[in-house]
Amino acid sequence: MSKSTAEIRQAFLDFFHSKGHQVVASSSLVPNNDPTLLFTNAGMNQFKDVFLGLDKRNYSRATTSQRCVRAGGKHNDLENVGYTARHHTFFEMLGNFSFGDYFKHDAIQFAWELLTGENWFALPKDRLWVTVYETDDEAYEIWEKEVGIPRERIIRIGDNKGAAYASDNFWQMGDTGPCGPCTEIFYDHGDHIWGGPPGSPEEDGDRYIEIWNIVFMQFNRQADGTMEPLPKPSVDTGMGLERIAAVLQHVNSNYEIDLFRTLIEAVAKVTGATDLSNKSLRVIADHIRSCAFLIADGVVPSNENRGYVLRRIIRRAVRHGNMLGAKETFFYKLVGPLIDVMGSAGEELKRQQAQVEQVLKTEEEQFARTLERGLALLDEELAKLSGDTLDGETAFRLYDTYGFPVDLTADVCRERNIKVDEAGFEAAMEEQRRRAREASGFGADYNAMIRVDGASEFKGYDHLELNGKVTALFVDGKAVDAISAGQEAVVVLDQTPFYAESGGQVGDKGELKGAGFAFAVSDTQKYGQAIGHIGTLSTGSLKVGDAVQADVDDARRARIRLNHSATHLMHAALRQILGTHVAQKGSLVNDKVLRFDFSHNEAMKPSEIRAVEDLVNAQIRRNLPVETNIMDLEAAKAKGAMALFGEKYDDRVRVLSMGDFSTELCGGTHASRTGDIGLFRIVSESGTAAGVRRIEAVTGEGAIATLHAESDRLSDIAQLLKGDSQNLGEKVRSVLERTRQLEKELQQLKEQAAAQESANLSSKAVDINGVKLLVSELAGVEPKMLRTMVDDLKNQLGSTVIVLATVAEGKVSLIAGVSKDVTDRVKAGELVGMVAQQVGGKGGGRPDMAQAGGTDAAALPAALASVKGWVSAKL
């Protein structure tokens, strides 16, 4: 009997756990460490920072079954889902990972053992083919000489994508960074299915199916294309759960595995469909998986970003339900069957089942109201069509009026061999966005909606004041011709010395003035290629076309420049002190402070903070020149300029250098020489997220002010200790030592008092069938002393049951002690639990000693009074 999909998933994880791998839970479908990624689409996503050296784990081997979505963005399988045997919007990627631990030999041997081992998947060895990168002789020899695969089933794949290292068998994270060859394992379904082995002209057939990709990360690709060997090569593998399930269950399509058969039957039941081969059943069975898990991971249907992708998938499923003849809302009814077939992987979904069902039901109900009318309109338009392309305006009208995502319209059209003018659709969509921005109403962020034709020339690198002309005015996000005194507005100039917020540096403040008017600028922002001066007209009136004198607040700008230059010095210093894994994750540079977020997986030690401070100040004392050059992006990278991971840059970039110490891409304003900074002080270091630290620092006058403040605090402390700041450390140590001595003496006194109290209490014990019972509430006794007292009393009383209680700050503390010879009849944990329940608490412990707490002090006397009857019944 073949394994179920759930059993296959578990077997994979169990196998690698037996090989020393940490079983790591699937991460969210919403990536939390990669803003460039729409959805988690591979098992390695959650380990990306580990492979990049930006994060460390307490394990060097890991295995996962990762939930993935490919629907939107670069990896978009949506239009193929339901029409092919192996495309899905949602799938599970089984993977094993080595972070500088094992490499090619073990990775290949592990894969072979799992696939062919009698106790594991037991696949026929003669059905397995492998590919290796053309020059990867090491992997080839492992497969041939150690595993024993015949040469005719080992295929070398070269650069088959038109460039060096552009190959199906060479994996790259990006243009630079970790990369390396990979070996892929294929399963031969047999000659009754059309297709040829990988690398052959017939490789696109369904006979030979890739089931496992094993990536060997052994190089670090540089900006100039050179490959540097990684000091600790790693392994990243991926095997689609649905694909291996199809192989192990002896079927040729993923949609024929047990998981999908069950879901397809559930879809047929809720839609009333009878033909189980209908492709719409496949579409819906696939889509319920992606939709349910996306909602469980916090995505909700909307018209933007991830929410819009979710909406598109839901509406595509609803439309296919309509094609099947569904008469009422059906999609949400599939969440329960989905949970049932997912096994342990569906536990989180089960916890959120009600919410997921409600979101799906609401979205389906909203779309159902317009679906039939929209389909009728589309049928009408297609009937009138003379060519083979539906115009973009009609596609947009279906979206705007009836809520049809363009890919849903394209789905309907494709079934009739008709294309959609998607460029025309996008043009109509952009026009609608423009109208929406202009007509924006109450409660909106008006300034964010401003769109300006034309550009402003920024001249603030060399000027802090210059003359310009007003090219546009905006009030509440709307273009106006003029403004009057008291009005808040955004003023756009043809040229300006004002720096618009960018790259972490805040926008400039200052004043625009001219004949009879003055405009106070409180912020400066970019609007496309234009620069907007945000503020209030203090006096007079201002209109488009007026000449103005633009004056930047030069003292504020000067402080910002110092902080920005210090940020660059600190970034370079952090990389020297902590390591080159340090990369900027965010920054804020204003006139008061600089804040810098960076990748590092532990809190900085005081010695490291001091070392960074000292190194930055050393560069300040060197008085290095701060120079800028405009050059091609690739030339800048070749020069060693640091670029931010995931940041987008133009082809021509501004490179800022500080002597031989720091080179970065930056468009901000800076000091002329590092000596201008004067002094650099770190005021705090903290964590903001996993693997991300934050430093706040001050420079110049701000740094001097912190020194004065610290000196004042030391003087205050010295006065309190009746000493001076020179010997403050010695004085504090003396006070702490004296405090420790006093605390020790106090503890001894408390213990003596407790012993005396115990002696007094022992006389109050009552005899119940040969067992001494002592129940007492003690005033003024610390809760932690109760245990000592119980131990003393047990020694004094012999066969005994003891319950002591005290109240401190309104909270009840309880302890029960039972001598060993009585625990077969009276359990301390049960006893203290009975009392705690009456005072609004709970607790437990061993049969001979147990503790509890409560919040209802008023109920304590009655609770203690109940002990005698409870114990008597047990004895």
Swiss-Prot record:
- Binding, Zn(2+): H564, H568, C666, H670
What the entry lists under PROSITE patterns is as follows: AA_TRNA_LIGASE_II_ALA
- Tell me the cofactors it needs: Zn(2+)
Cofactor note from UniProt?
Binds 1 zinc ion per subunit.
Q: Which UniProt keywords are listed?
A: Aminoacyl-tRNA synthetase, ATP-binding, Cytoplasm, Ligase, Metal-binding, Nucleotide-binding, Protein biosynthesis, RNA-binding, tRNA-binding, Zinc
Annotated localization: Cytoplasm
Q: What is its main location?
A: cytoplasm
What is any one GO biological process for this UniProt entry?
A: alanyl-tRNA aminoacylation
Q: Which GO terms describe its molecular function?
A: alanine-tRNA ligase activity; aminoacyl-tRNA deacylase activity; ATP binding; tRNA binding; zinc ion binding
Q: Which GO terms describe its cellular component?
A: cytosol
* E.C. numbers: 6.1.1.7
Q: Which reaction does it catalyse?
A: tRNA(Ala) + L-alanine + ATP = L-alanyl-tRNA(Ala) + AMP + diphosphate
Cited Pfam families:
DHHA1 (PF02272), tRNA-synt_2c (PF01411), tRNA_SAD (PF07973)
- Family membership, please give it: Belongs to the class-II aminoacyl-tRNA synthetase family.
Subunit structure of this chain's protein: Homotetramer.
Domain comment in the entry: Consists of three domains; the N-terminal catalytic domain, the editing domain and the C-terminal C-Ala domain. The editing domain removes incorrectly charged amino acids, while the C-Ala domain, along with tRNA(Ala), serves as a bridge to cooperatively bring together the editing and aminoacylation centers thus stimulating deacylation of misacylated tRNAs.
What does the function comment of this entry state?
Catalyzes the attachment of alanine to tRNA(Ala) in a two-step reaction: alanine is first activated by ATP to form Ala-AMP and then transferred to the acceptor end of tRNA(Ala). Also edits incorrectly charged Ser-tRNA(Ala) and Gly-tRNA(Ala) via its editing domain.
Question: Which protein is depicted?
Answer: Alanine--tRNA ligase
Q: Which organism is it from?
A: Citrobacter koseri (strain ATCC BAA-895 / CDC 4225-83 / SGSC4696)
